[in-house]
Amino acid sequence: MCKAGFAGDDAPRAVFPSIVGRPRHQGVMVGMGQKDSYVGDEAQSKRGILTLKYPIEHGIVYNWDDMEKIWHHTFYNELRVAPEEHPVLLTEAPLNPKANLEKMTQIMFETFNTPAMYVAIQAVLSLYASGRTTGIVMDSGDGVTHTVPIYEGYALPHAILRLDLAGRDLTDYLMKILTERYGYSFTTTAEREIVRDIKEKLCYVALDFEQEMATAASSSSLEKSYELPDGQVITIGNERFRCPEALFQPSFLGMESCGIHETTFNSIMKCDVDIRKDLYANTVLSGGTTMYPGIADRMQKEITALAPSTMKIKIIAPPERKYSVWIGGSILASLSTFQQMWISKQEYDESGPSIVHRKCF
């Protein structure tokens, strides 16, 4: 999802999927005003006749032409502003390739002629939004999950851990288990969007996975039904919690990595022993993939089991955490002290795209 708006606002003006769709078929009706590409919600609503492409994978932009289309759509259609008149704050997943940052910077200054821009780390913004300067943020979105410990406003880069398992992987996993169990076939890019909706509406995290599996096997109390766009009704049972369980047990997806609870714990353990107590007591969840009911209680339980027995552990799951990165950006960009941090067009012209590494991190 792309979230865009104005500094100082308390919520984004525009929230739309970061997708670009192109027609799968030849247009036959003259004067229909068919376009060669559609972005965001329009691509979503016409998805049945389009091939949908996601320019961002695992938090990294792979298709810059499509990314440019998304930004163009954001400025001109969603926000209706001239980019050359406004400084732009972008966000980035930590530990992304350096070239990714430079290319973003280059496009903003050269294609959109912005007067100034800045790239902030997503997790740091979530912490701002929660009103803290110290804590560990577990941020999980569509493409990437990362844990970022922050102390007195400084991110601790050596302790940042990244997990390439997030919302899109869970959607794919749900497609797979629904197909295996019920023979429903979800294959096209458009059908993936239906499964994403099922996931967002019906999935939850079990406090005790084994016990929940037993409950699901012995009664139908956990079953829920969902109506597909063609009117067919499907029923889903243990898939409701089996899908997000992969966050805690990535082996479900055939991945050898640690779950989000262990990754958070490992991140804390990479920090200086003196500050761990503050991190345990300020564990902040952010991003759309942390929106499952039950996830905070489960994190509390899992981290308590890993941490020293006397440690006070507090999981903070703000209700607006789906947008907390954006809200943090809105706060940051409106601070008077931030105004000297922007990279100006003049600085860019003097130093080129590499200026972003010096000024932003």
Swiss-Prot record:
The keyword Lipid biosynthesis does not apply. Its main location: cytoplasm. The modification Tele-methylhistidine is found at H58. It is found in: Cytoplasm, Cytoskeleton; Nucleus. Transmembrane segments: none annotated. SMART domains: ACTIN. Its EC number is 3.6.4.-. The modification Methionine (R)-sulfoxide is found at M29, M32. The keyword Metal-binding does not apply. The modification N6-methyllysine is found at K69. Actin is a highly conserved protein that polymerizes to produce filaments that form cross-linked networks in the cytoplasm of cells. Actin exists in both monomeric (G-actin) and polymeric (F-actin) forms, both forms playing key functions, such as cell motility and contraction. In addition to their role in the cytoplasmic cytoskeleton, G- and F-actin also localize in the nucleus, and regulate gene transcription and motility and repair of damaged DNA. In vertebrates 3 main groups of actin isoforms, alpha, beta and gamma have been identified. The alpha actins are found in muscle tissues and are a major constituent of the contractile apparatus. The beta and gamma actins coexist in most cell types as components of the cytoskeleton and as mediators of internal cell motility. Polymerization of globular actin (G-actin) leads to a structural filament (F-actin) in the form of a two-stranded helix. Each actin can bind to 4 others. Identified in a IGF2BP1-dependent mRNP granule complex containing untranslated mRNAs. Component of the BAF complex, which includes at least actin (ACTB), ARID1A, ARID1B/BAF250, SMARCA2, SMARCA4/BRG1, ACTL6A/BAF53, ACTL6B/BAF53B, SMARCE1/BAF57 SMARCC1/BAF155, SMARCC2/BAF170, SMARCB1/SNF5/INI1, and one or more of SMARCD1/BAF60A, SMARCD2/BAF60B, or SMARCD3/BAF60C. In muscle cells, the BAF complex also contains DPF3. This is Actin, cytoplasmic 1. It comes from Chlorocebus pygerythrus (Vervet monkey). The gene is ACTB.
